[in-house]
Amino acid sequence: MNVAGLIVGLGNPGKEYERTRHNLGFMAVDALMEAAARETGGGCDQLSGGKKKYDLWRCRITPTGDPWLVAKPQTFMNLSGEAVLAIASYYRIKPDAILVVHDELDIPLGRMKFKTGGGNAGHNGLKSITQLLGTPDFHRLRLGIGRSPHGGETTNWVLGRLSGPEQTLLDTLLPAAVQAMTIFASQGAAAATQFANAYKPD
């Protein structure tokens, strides 16, 4: 099966983690798949559901060209690399054709940044993927969650749910994140970087 690459949304499985800050990656790829169903006519076909390590879809993200794989690891965040490595190995996808979508403490909520390679900024999902792929040279779409205005323990913040005003910002960010992923799929990393890094909420 020919595929253009792999887009991975990071998060934690289970209802207790739904709509938490750490699950922005899951929310973003869900929005991407909804957009694919609306706009390309092809939508997404589920290839693997309920597997131990991941849920996987084949999606027609752009009207032309090969479809993309879209994945949501089911391993919990700290073991995300196990899912990414399993998919990349089976489908023979190289790191430069992988985009990981994740939450980012160092970017304010409502903003996003696209980058290729680099460090993990303390993100355990990225750390796991880097270790198991053996390289940091994959693409990342970093969705801002900001840091707690009250300080305190980071774990409680990232696993907390969004407030009403935060949800409003997220509702604006997700369509823009979908656009960034679509630009990456159709035009490449440079164009996606230009769009994502210039994006500001209204």
From Swiss-Prot:
The record marks 12 as: Discriminates between blocked and unblocked aminoacyl-tRNA. GO terms for molecular function: peptidyl-tRNA hydrolase activity; tRNA binding. It is found in: Cytoplasm. The record marks 103 as: Stabilizes the basic form of H active site to accept a proton. It is an enzyme of class 3 (hydrolase). The keyword Cytoplasm applies. GO terms for biological process: protein quality control for misfolded or incompletely synthesized proteins; rescue of stalled ribosome. The active site is at 22 (proton acceptor). TRNA binds at residues 17, 76, 78, 124. GO terms for cellular component: cytoplasm. It comes from the Bacteria. Its main location: cytoplasm. Keywords: Cytoplasm, Hydrolase, RNA-binding, tRNA-binding. Its EC number is 3.1.1.29. PROSITE patterns: PEPT_TRNA_HYDROL_1 (PS01195), PEPT_TRNA_HYDROL_2 (PS01196). Belongs to the PTH family. Monomer. This is Peptidyl-tRNA hydrolase. The lineage of its organism: Bacteria, Pseudomonadati, Thermodesulfobacteriota, Desulfovibrionia, Desulfovibrionales. The gene is pth.
